[in-house]
């Protein structure tokens, strides 16, 4: 790897996951479209996707799709159901079901230099577990170092700030 040594000081490297280390946008859009139709009878628009879905915790997205009418129990149900559909779509998409080129080599480099790194993602825990198992991410990052949507974060920015 041709990585130039640097004198930049930092505490940790934080990676986003979906759409950065793993190109899965089409699977998310397909799953959210399916649930938008189920919840409100219509699919999602590109504007809704950009403003209310991408990078937003599931609870907020489902609250948006339901017009704020769902109970916490309904929100949790649809969140789990949507993500199960998403995981199925990922496994069916065998051509794209892998980390981006160079990710594993870069993780190896960071680990060899003892540079701490982690992943912060708006994904829920079952998806994080799915990614860890599917891509063997625990070769580089301990399971308890992943930051994910556990219902306590307002947005992805808060997750990134908490990551290191």
Please tell me what each predicted stretch does.
Residues 1-4:
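A short, compositionally biased domain-edge/stem linker segment
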Residues 6-101, 109, 113:
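N-terminal helical cap/lid subdomain that shapes the substrate entry/recognition surface
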Residues 12, 154-164:
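Conserved Lys-Pro-Asp/Glu-containing loop-to-beta segment of HAD-superfamily phosphomonoesterases
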Residues 26-30, 130, 158:
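Generic recognition of short, well-ordered alpha-helical segments
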Residues 27, 57, 105, 126-127, ...:
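Short alpha-helical
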Residues 39, 64-68, 104, 108-118, ...:
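Substrate-recognition/cap helix-loop segment adjacent to the acidic, metal-dependent catalytic center
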Residues 102-106, 159-162:
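Well-ordered alpha-helical segments embedded in enzymatic catalytic cores
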């Amino acid at each position: 790897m041709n990585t130039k040594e640097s004198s930049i000081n930092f505490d940790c490297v934080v990676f986003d996951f979906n759409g950065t280390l793993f190109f899965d946008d089409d699977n998310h859009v397909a799953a959210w479209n399916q649930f938008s139709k189920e919840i409100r009878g219509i699919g999602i628009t590109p504007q809704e996707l950009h403003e209310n879905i991408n990078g937003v915790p599931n609870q907020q997205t489902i609250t948006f799709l339901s017009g704020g009418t769902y109970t916490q129990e309904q929100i949790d149900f649809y969140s789990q159901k949507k993500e199960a559909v998403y995981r199925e779509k990922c496994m069916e998409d065998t051509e794209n079901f892998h980390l981006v080129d160079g990710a594993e080599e870069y993780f190896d480099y960071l680990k060899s230099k003892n540079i701490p790194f982690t992943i912060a993602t708006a994904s829920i825990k079952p998806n994080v577990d799915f990614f860890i198992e599917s891509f063997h991410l625990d070769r580089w990052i301990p399971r308890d170092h992943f930051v994910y949507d556990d219902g306590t974060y307002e947005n992805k920015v808060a997750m990134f700030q908490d990551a290191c």
